[in-house]
Protein backbone atom coordinates (compact mmCIF):
# COMPACT_ATOMS: atom_id res chain seq x y z
CA UNK A 1 0.00 0.00 0.00
CA UNK A 2 2.90 2.37 0.81
CA UNK A 3 4.33 1.71 -2.63
CA UNK A 4 0.97 2.56 -4.19
CA UNK A 5 0.79 5.96 -2.48
CA UNK A 6 4.40 6.78 -3.36
CA UNK A 7 3.77 5.89 -7.00
CA UNK A 8 0.55 7.87 -7.00
CA UNK A 9 2.24 10.96 -5.55
CA UNK A 10 5.02 10.80 -8.12
CA UNK A 11 2.53 10.36 -10.96
CA UNK A 12 0.44 13.29 -9.76
CA UNK A 13 3.54 15.48 -9.56
CA UNK A 14 4.43 14.54 -13.13
CA UNK A 15 0.93 15.40 -14.31
CA UNK A 16 1.02 18.72 -12.48
CA UNK A 17 4.39 19.75 -13.90
CA UNK A 18 2.90 20.52 -17.30
CA UNK A 19 0.21 22.88 -16.06
CA UNK A 20 2.06 26.18 -16.20
CA UNK A 21 0.54 29.48 -15.26
CA UNK A 22 -2.25 30.53 -17.57
CA UNK A 23 -5.88 31.54 -17.32
CA UNK A 24 -7.25 28.09 -18.12
CA UNK A 25 -8.24 25.61 -15.45
CA UNK A 26 -6.23 22.42 -15.99
CA UNK A 27 -8.09 19.11 -16.19
CA UNK A 28 -5.71 16.39 -15.04
CA UNK A 29 -7.02 13.52 -17.15
CA UNK A 30 -5.75 9.97 -16.58
CA UNK A 31 -6.53 7.67 -19.51
CA UNK A 32 -6.28 3.95 -20.12
CA UNK A 33 -6.20 4.26 -23.93
CA UNK A 34 -3.05 4.39 -26.06
CA UNK A 35 -2.52 5.39 -29.68
CA UNK A 36 -2.97 1.79 -30.89
CA UNK A 37 -6.45 1.50 -29.39
CA UNK A 38 -9.57 2.03 -31.48
CA UNK A 39 -11.06 4.13 -28.66
CA UNK A 40 -8.14 6.58 -28.56
CA UNK A 41 -9.41 9.02 -31.25
CA UNK A 42 -12.82 9.47 -29.58
CA UNK A 43 -11.27 10.28 -26.23
CA UNK A 44 -8.69 12.64 -27.74
CA UNK A 45 -11.46 14.41 -29.68
CA UNK A 46 -13.43 14.90 -26.44
CA UNK A 47 -10.39 16.37 -24.72
CA UNK A 48 -9.77 18.72 -27.62
CA UNK A 49 -13.40 19.85 -27.55
CA UNK A 50 -13.18 20.52 -23.81
CA UNK A 51 -10.08 22.66 -24.34
CA UNK A 52 -11.66 24.51 -27.28
CA UNK A 53 -15.04 24.97 -25.59
CA UNK A 54 -14.36 28.52 -24.44
CA UNK A 55 -15.12 27.50 -20.86
CA UNK A 56 -11.58 28.13 -19.68
CA UNK A 57 -10.54 24.49 -19.37
CA UNK A 58 -7.42 22.73 -20.60
CA UNK A 59 -7.31 18.93 -20.73
CA UNK A 60 -3.88 17.60 -19.74
CA UNK A 61 -3.62 13.90 -20.52
CA UNK A 62 -1.63 11.14 -18.79
CA UNK A 63 -1.72 7.36 -19.37
CA UNK A 64 -1.87 4.56 -16.83
CA UNK A 65 0.67 2.43 -18.70
CA UNK A 66 3.16 5.24 -19.29
CA UNK A 67 3.12 6.15 -15.61
CA UNK A 68 3.23 2.54 -14.44
CA UNK A 69 -0.10 2.83 -12.62
CA UNK A 70 -2.50 -0.07 -12.09
CA UNK A 71 -5.92 0.33 -13.71
CA UNK A 72 -7.46 -1.43 -10.70
CA UNK A 73 -6.40 1.55 -8.56
CA UNK A 74 -8.50 4.03 -10.57
CA UNK A 75 -11.09 4.64 -7.86
CA UNK A 76 -8.40 5.35 -5.29
CA UNK A 77 -6.68 7.75 -7.67
CA UNK A 78 -9.82 9.77 -8.34
CA UNK A 79 -10.89 9.72 -4.68
CA UNK A 80 -7.49 11.04 -3.56
CA UNK A 81 -7.70 13.97 -5.98
CA UNK A 82 -4.43 13.01 -7.65
CA UNK A 83 -6.31 13.34 -10.94
CA UNK A 84 -9.47 15.21 -11.84
CA UNK A 85 -10.76 12.78 -14.49
CA UNK A 86 -9.92 9.07 -14.50
CA UNK A 87 -11.07 6.34 -16.87
CA UNK A 88 -11.27 2.74 -15.68
CA UNK A 89 -12.43 -0.78 -16.41
CA UNK A 90 -15.31 -1.12 -13.95
CA UNK A 91 -14.91 -4.84 -13.32
CA UNK A 92 -11.27 -4.39 -12.36
CA UNK A 93 -12.00 -1.43 -10.10
CA UNK A 94 -14.86 -3.31 -8.41
CA UNK A 95 -12.38 -4.96 -6.06
CA UNK A 96 -12.97 -1.84 -3.95
CA UNK A 97 -16.77 -2.24 -4.10
CA UNK A 98 -18.53 -5.33 -5.56
CA UNK A 99 -21.67 -3.27 -6.22
CA UNK A 100 -19.99 -1.64 -9.20
CA UNK A 101 -19.52 -4.94 -11.04
CA UNK A 102 -23.28 -5.35 -11.06
CA UNK A 103 -23.47 -3.10 -14.11
CA UNK A 104 -21.94 -5.82 -16.32
CA UNK A 105 -22.08 -9.22 -14.65
CA UNK A 106 -20.97 -12.15 -16.75
CA UNK A 107 -23.72 -13.72 -18.84
CA UNK A 108 -26.35 -11.05 -18.12
CA UNK A 109 -25.99 -8.64 -21.05
CA UNK A 110 -24.13 -10.37 -23.86
CA UNK A 111 -25.02 -8.08 -26.78
CA UNK A 112 -24.79 -4.32 -27.16
CA UNK A 113 -28.55 -3.65 -27.10
CA UNK A 114 -29.08 -5.56 -23.86
CA UNK A 115 -25.99 -3.96 -22.37
CA UNK A 116 -27.15 -0.45 -23.27
CA UNK A 117 -30.49 -1.09 -21.57
CA UNK A 118 -28.74 -2.46 -18.49
CA UNK A 119 -26.39 0.52 -18.23
CA UNK A 120 -29.25 2.98 -18.63
CA UNK A 121 -31.17 1.22 -15.86
CA UNK A 122 -28.19 1.11 -13.47
CA UNK A 123 -26.64 4.50 -14.23
CA UNK A 124 -28.37 6.51 -11.50
CA UNK A 125 -27.63 4.16 -8.61
CA UNK A 126 -24.14 3.48 -10.00
CA UNK A 127 -23.38 7.21 -9.97
CA UNK A 128 -24.85 7.57 -6.48
CA UNK A 129 -22.71 4.73 -5.12
CA UNK A 130 -19.57 6.15 -6.76
CA UNK A 131 -20.32 9.46 -5.06
CA UNK A 132 -20.96 7.96 -1.63
CA UNK A 133 -17.98 5.59 -1.58
CA UNK A 134 -15.36 7.38 -3.62
CA UNK A 135 -16.22 11.07 -3.71
CA UNK A 136 -16.55 11.00 -7.47
CA UNK A 137 -19.10 11.63 -10.20
CA UNK A 138 -19.73 9.54 -13.32
CA UNK A 139 -19.47 11.49 -16.58
CA UNK A 140 -19.44 8.64 -19.10
CA UNK A 141 -20.14 4.89 -19.18
CA UNK A 142 -19.22 2.90 -22.30
CA UNK A 143 -18.19 -0.60 -23.46
CA UNK A 144 -15.16 -2.03 -25.20
CA UNK A 145 -17.52 -4.53 -26.80
CA UNK A 146 -18.25 -8.26 -26.71
CA UNK A 147 -15.84 -10.22 -24.52
CA UNK A 148 -14.87 -13.41 -26.33
CA UNK A 149 -12.33 -16.24 -26.05
CA UNK A 150 -8.87 -16.31 -27.67
CA UNK A 151 -6.87 -19.53 -27.20
CA UNK A 152 -3.46 -20.82 -28.24
CA UNK A 153 -4.81 -24.30 -28.93
CA UNK A 154 -7.85 -25.72 -30.76
CA UNK A 155 -11.21 -24.74 -29.28
CA UNK A 156 -14.63 -25.34 -30.81
CA UNK A 157 -16.96 -25.23 -27.80
CA UNK A 158 -16.87 -24.28 -24.14
CA UNK A 159 -16.13 -27.92 -23.29
CA UNK A 160 -12.69 -27.42 -24.82
CA UNK A 161 -11.82 -24.97 -22.04
CA UNK A 162 -11.74 -27.75 -19.43
CA UNK A 163 -8.41 -27.88 -17.55
CA UNK A 164 -7.10 -24.81 -19.41
CA UNK A 165 -5.81 -21.64 -17.75
CA UNK A 166 -7.96 -18.72 -18.89
CA UNK A 167 -7.13 -15.07 -18.28
CA UNK A 168 -9.88 -13.31 -16.33
CA UNK A 169 -10.23 -9.73 -15.13
CA UNK A 170 -13.42 -9.63 -13.05
CA UNK A 171 -14.69 -11.77 -10.15
CA UNK A 172 -17.84 -12.87 -11.99
CA UNK A 173 -15.78 -13.83 -15.05
CA UNK A 174 -13.60 -16.00 -12.84
CA UNK A 175 -16.71 -17.68 -11.44
CA UNK A 176 -17.90 -18.54 -14.96
CA UNK A 177 -14.49 -19.89 -15.95
CA UNK A 178 -14.41 -22.10 -12.86
CA UNK A 179 -17.90 -23.40 -13.64
CA UNK A 180 -16.68 -24.36 -17.11
CA UNK A 181 -13.97 -26.55 -15.59
CA UNK A 182 -11.12 -24.18 -16.39
CA UNK A 183 -8.77 -22.26 -14.11
CA UNK A 184 -9.11 -18.46 -14.04
CA UNK A 185 -5.84 -16.54 -14.05
CA UNK A 186 -5.94 -12.87 -13.10
CA UNK A 187 -3.54 -11.05 -15.44
CA UNK A 188 -3.42 -7.29 -16.22
CA UNK A 189 -3.97 -6.61 -19.90
CA UNK A 190 -0.38 -5.47 -20.66
CA UNK A 191 0.89 -8.81 -19.32
CA UNK A 192 -1.49 -11.07 -21.24
CA UNK A 193 0.59 -11.25 -24.45
CA UNK A 194 3.72 -12.64 -22.73
CA UNK A 195 1.56 -14.87 -20.53
CA UNK A 196 -0.04 -16.46 -23.59
CA UNK A 197 3.33 -16.66 -25.29
CA UNK A 198 4.98 -18.46 -22.35
CA UNK A 199 2.07 -20.73 -21.48
CA UNK A 200 1.16 -19.03 -18.21
CA UNK A 201 -2.31 -18.78 -19.77
CA UNK A 202 -3.83 -20.91 -22.53
CA UNK A 203 -6.68 -18.52 -23.32
CA UNK A 204 -7.78 -14.99 -22.65
CA UNK A 205 -11.08 -13.12 -22.67
CA UNK A 206 -11.28 -9.66 -24.21
CA UNK A 207 -12.93 -7.79 -27.08
CA UNK A 208 -11.89 -8.54 -30.68
CA UNK A 209 -10.52 -5.03 -31.15
CA UNK A 210 -8.53 -5.10 -27.89
CA UNK A 211 -7.08 -8.49 -28.81
CA UNK A 212 -6.09 -7.40 -32.30
CA UNK A 213 -4.52 -4.10 -31.29
CA UNK A 214 -2.87 -5.93 -28.38
CA UNK A 215 -1.39 -8.43 -30.90
CA UNK A 216 -2.98 -11.45 -29.24
CA UNK A 217 -3.36 -13.23 -32.62
CA UNK A 218 0.44 -13.51 -32.67
CA UNK A 219 0.27 -15.82 -29.65
CA UNK A 220 -3.17 -17.42 -30.09
CA UNK A 221 -4.61 -19.56 -32.87
CA UNK A 222 -8.34 -20.01 -32.20
CA UNK A 223 -11.19 -17.57 -31.59
CA UNK A 224 -14.53 -18.53 -30.04
CA UNK A 225 -16.78 -15.47 -30.57
CA UNK A 226 -19.14 -16.27 -27.70
CA UNK A 227 -19.75 -13.01 -25.87
CA UNK A 228 -20.00 -13.20 -22.09
CA UNK A 229 -20.10 -9.46 -21.27
CA UNK A 230 -19.32 -6.01 -22.71
CA UNK A 231 -16.39 -4.83 -20.56
CA UNK A 232 -17.95 -1.63 -19.24
CA UNK A 233 -15.65 1.35 -18.73
CA UNK A 234 -16.32 4.63 -16.95
CA UNK A 235 -14.92 8.14 -16.91
CA UNK A 236 -15.09 9.51 -13.37
CA UNK A 237 -14.43 13.00 -12.03
CA UNK A 238 -13.36 13.96 -8.52
CA UNK A 239 -16.44 15.49 -6.87
CA UNK A 240 -14.56 18.13 -4.87
CA UNK A 241 -12.78 19.34 -8.00
CA UNK A 242 -16.07 19.30 -9.92
CA UNK A 243 -17.73 21.49 -7.29
CA UNK A 244 -15.09 24.18 -7.86
CA UNK A 245 -15.92 24.49 -11.57
CA UNK A 246 -18.30 27.20 -12.67
CA UNK A 247 -21.59 26.25 -14.40
CA UNK A 248 -20.15 26.89 -17.88
CA UNK A 249 -17.23 24.57 -17.20
CA UNK A 250 -19.45 21.85 -15.79
CA UNK A 251 -21.74 22.13 -18.80
CA UNK A 252 -18.80 21.85 -21.21
CA UNK A 253 -17.40 18.78 -19.46
CA UNK A 254 -20.82 17.11 -19.27
CA UNK A 255 -21.63 17.84 -22.92
CA UNK A 256 -18.33 16.65 -24.36
CA UNK A 257 -18.08 13.48 -22.31
CA UNK A 258 -21.67 12.57 -23.14
CA UNK A 259 -20.78 12.95 -26.80
CA UNK A 260 -17.69 10.82 -26.26
CA UNK A 261 -19.87 8.17 -24.61
CA UNK A 262 -22.20 8.11 -27.62
CA UNK A 263 -19.23 7.85 -29.97
CA UNK A 264 -17.71 4.97 -28.02
CA UNK A 265 -21.00 3.03 -27.90
CA UNK A 266 -21.29 3.44 -31.67
CA UNK A 267 -17.70 2.28 -32.07
CA UNK A 268 -18.27 -0.82 -29.93
CA UNK A 269 -21.20 -1.80 -32.16
CA UNK A 270 -19.12 -1.68 -35.35
CA UNK A 271 -15.37 -1.94 -34.73
CA UNK A 272 -15.36 -5.47 -33.35
CA UNK A 273 -16.70 -7.02 -36.56
CA UNK A 274 -13.78 -5.49 -38.43
CA UNK A 275 -11.38 -6.67 -35.72
CA UNK A 276 -12.70 -10.22 -35.99
CA UNK A 277 -12.40 -10.15 -39.78
CA UNK A 278 -8.81 -8.97 -39.52
CA UNK A 279 -7.88 -11.54 -36.89
CA UNK A 280 -9.13 -14.42 -39.06
CA UNK A 281 -7.79 -12.99 -42.34
CA UNK A 282 -11.18 -12.14 -43.82
CA UNK A 283 -12.32 -9.09 -45.78
CA UNK A 284 -13.36 -6.40 -45.19
CA UNK A 285 -10.45 -5.60 -42.91
CA UNK A 286 -9.58 -1.94 -42.50
CA UNK A 287 -5.82 -1.23 -42.50
CA UNK A 288 -6.09 0.75 -39.26
CA UNK A 289 -6.27 0.21 -36.36
CA UNK A 290 -6.27 -3.54 -36.98
CA UNK A 291 -3.77 -5.97 -38.49
CA UNK A 292 -4.62 -9.04 -40.58
CA UNK A 293 -3.85 -12.47 -39.09
CA UNK A 294 -4.92 -16.07 -39.81
CA UNK A 295 -6.71 -17.28 -36.70
CA UNK A 296 -9.30 -20.07 -36.84
CA UNK A 297 -12.86 -18.94 -36.06
CA UNK A 298 -15.19 -21.35 -34.25
CA UNK A 299 -18.96 -21.35 -34.60
CA UNK A 300 -20.96 -20.53 -31.47
CA UNK A 301 -23.18 -23.46 -30.51
CA UNK A 302 -26.68 -22.66 -29.16
CA UNK A 303 -25.97 -25.09 -26.31
CA UNK A 304 -23.01 -22.95 -25.23
CA UNK A 305 -25.14 -19.81 -25.20
CA UNK A 306 -27.66 -21.56 -22.97
CA UNK A 307 -24.88 -22.87 -20.75
CA UNK A 308 -23.53 -19.37 -20.11
CA UNK A 309 -27.03 -18.07 -19.42
CA UNK A 310 -27.69 -20.87 -16.93
CA UNK A 311 -24.38 -20.47 -15.09
CA UNK A 312 -24.99 -16.76 -14.85
CA UNK A 313 -28.53 -17.10 -13.49
CA UNK A 314 -27.84 -19.96 -11.09
CA UNK A 315 -24.31 -19.24 -9.90
CA UNK A 316 -22.81 -15.90 -10.93
CA UNK A 317 -25.70 -13.72 -9.75
CA UNK A 318 -26.10 -15.36 -6.36
CA UNK A 319 -22.35 -15.39 -5.66
CA UNK A 320 -22.06 -11.72 -6.60
CA UNK A 321 -25.08 -10.78 -4.48
CA UNK A 322 -23.56 -12.50 -1.45
CA UNK A 323 -20.33 -10.51 -1.84
CA UNK A 324 -22.16 -7.29 -2.56
CA UNK A 325 -24.59 -7.50 0.36
CA UNK A 326 -21.68 -7.60 2.82
CA UNK A 327 -20.71 -4.07 1.81
CA UNK A 328 -24.09 -2.76 0.68
CA UNK A 329 -27.14 -4.36 2.36
CA UNK A 330 -29.55 -3.05 -0.30
CA UNK A 331 -27.46 -4.41 -3.15
CA UNK A 332 -29.70 -7.26 -4.27
CA UNK A 333 -32.86 -5.17 -4.11
CA UNK A 334 -31.21 -2.35 -6.08
CA UNK A 335 -30.03 -4.72 -8.80
CA UNK A 336 -33.35 -6.56 -9.10
CA UNK A 337 -35.17 -3.25 -9.49
CA UNK A 338 -32.90 -1.97 -12.25
CA UNK A 339 -30.91 -4.37 -14.42
CA UNK A 340 -32.88 -7.36 -13.19
CA UNK A 341 -36.07 -5.64 -14.30
CA UNK A 342 -34.90 -4.84 -17.85
CA UNK A 343 -33.20 -8.24 -18.29
CA UNK A 344 -36.08 -10.19 -16.72
CA UNK A 345 -33.84 -11.67 -14.03
CA UNK A 346 -34.31 -11.88 -10.26
CA UNK A 347 -31.72 -12.71 -7.63
CA UNK A 348 -33.60 -14.65 -4.93
Explain the meaning of each model-derived region.
Residues 1-9:
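Bacterial N-terminal signal peptides that target proteins for export
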Residues 110-133:
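Short, solvent-exposed loop/beta-turn-alpha elements that line the ligand-binding surface or hinge
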Residues 24-112, 132-348:
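N-terminal secretory/targeting leader peptides
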